[in-house]
Amino acid sequence: MSKTIAINAGSSSLKWQLYQMPEEKVLAQGIIERIGLTDSISTVKYDGKKEEHILDIPDHTEAVKRLLNDLIHFGIIGTYDEITGVGHRIVAGGEYFKESVVVDDKVVEQVEELAALAPLHNPGAAAGIRAFRKILPDITSVCVFDTSFHTTMQKHTYLYPIPQKYYTDYKVRKYGAHGTSHKYVAEEAAKMLGRPLDELKLITAHVGNGVSITANYHGQSVDTSMGFTPLAGPMMGTRSGDIDPAIIPYLIAQDPELKDAADVVNMLNKQSGLGGVSGISSDMRDIEAGLQANNPDAVLAYNIFIDRIKKFIGQYFAVLNGADALVFTAGMGENAPLMRQDVVNGLSWFGMEIDPEKNVFGYRGDISTAASKVKVLVISTDEELCIARDVERLKQTIS
């Protein structure tokens, strides 16, 4: 019996979940937010309790110290020695990593080197890895990459139609993201459908603040909507998704506040999407409230959001030459029935039909009608559990 921590570290946050393995029992979970500020927030949930404290956490090393001390303070563990493994979620693994790996110095350097592919994620993840290695140097540390699942894409799918020297010299290509989530929900969908995964064609829709759609053929990713970075694909919470790239130099020339390409990319990453179009919020709950109030900007943002998701799902019906099921997961995918209904209503030609009595908040499972030729499933993703499982698997290889 061992205890494993799954870590999702960002530039100013550290989200964690502690498991008892191999039972896969969640012992505690929490998040440390606003790292680097004097009013950082540490939240711990365990045994039905919730503890929240505001304090000064200047960096990721102090965040990890706080996390470990909280585990002891609240009696969740007795000593640090009870923790035998830690797994880190890494958004971008580039072409270096086709599967999860045990961390060493070279791995950390490569994660940092790939920061350009995930500037909002990889630097914080690397800081989290370094912090754990400093404080718990003797435990097994593992990196689990969002991009690994998508390394099964064929070359004609992952290459962009630009001169090949940009791939050979600079590795410019589609990498995808959310792979851990897409892999998990595809496996769960096969169980739900009672069929082997290697016989199924699935379209998985991870719809959270970040949005990605994946075409899954017999258990493998054959195409996905995120690209060289997680900025590509449908409209998202704060990200634009796909736009005409010629817009970037045009905006630099027109808007004095946008001085260079980095400024435009920052705007596309952080000030666009639902929040940017609506001017209200990047949260679908706020957008739906705007719909009820007939706010025209909320209506416009919502309509663009639905339109872009439908288009990617439609593409992947073509890529797969049909599909057995459409799977919704992540924050909005699991908790926004109106969004699911409006997406599927626009895809009825493919033989999908939602049962309105099942398509309600909190329902998990098959939400399609008996007559629906393509099943529509709602499955809760569990990236943290996937990370913990990979830690346990890799621990066996080095024991």
Curated annotation (Swiss-Prot):
Entry keyword annotation includes ATP-binding? yes
Active site positions, chain numbering: 146
| Sites marked Transition state stabilizer | 178, 239
**Which residues does the record give as ATP binding sites?**
15, 206-210, 283-285, 331-335
What cofactor(s) does the depicted protein rely on? Mg(2+); Mn(2+)
Q: What positions does the entry give for Mg(2+) binding?
A: 8, 383
Q: What is its main location?
A: cytoplasm
Family membership noted in the UniProt record:
Belongs to the acetokinase family.
By what name is this protein known? Acetate kinase
Source organism: Streptococcus equi subsp. equi (strain 4047)
